[in-house]
Amino acid sequence: MTGHTFDMRQANCSVSAAGALRGLHFAQLPPSQAKYVTCVTGSVFDVVVDIRVGSPTYGHWDSVLLDDVDRRSVYLSEGLAHAFLALQDDSMVMYLCSAPYAPQREHTVTATDPAIGIEWPLPAEQLVLSERDAAAPSLAEARAAGLLPTWADSQAFVESLRRR
């Protein structure tokens, strides 16, 4: 239950080798990008981080195992960051998005930022990151650069969706 209509604007499919770490990704608010994520084949350790400045849970993270056995899914509201770690070769993640991909509005925070402290189930030397993700700023650097959404702005945006 999202509290508002989830208008799907784009569907993405990502296939990853074991050890591939993708994220932490997020889009500028508004409109940001809500996501509904599931793992079609294989398994991934899926992580959501609250990056909304001023939120009572700012900087906190939670995780769920998404796989082709239990068929769990996760919904990410606008203003949150997302990452996943492929635990098996050919792990396929499908995500439905509320806004189309807009590269100029997309940002990253390093998924290995010690200040966030995500407990990845593989040792750091086994993690494989893209160039973009490896060069991502820390949460503090992204905040100082004004890239992060605020709690107030995200709440106002979600409320505007409820009134539609």
Q: Where in the sequence are the language-model features?
A:
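Ligand-binding loop in jelly-roll beta-barrel domains
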Residues: 78-97
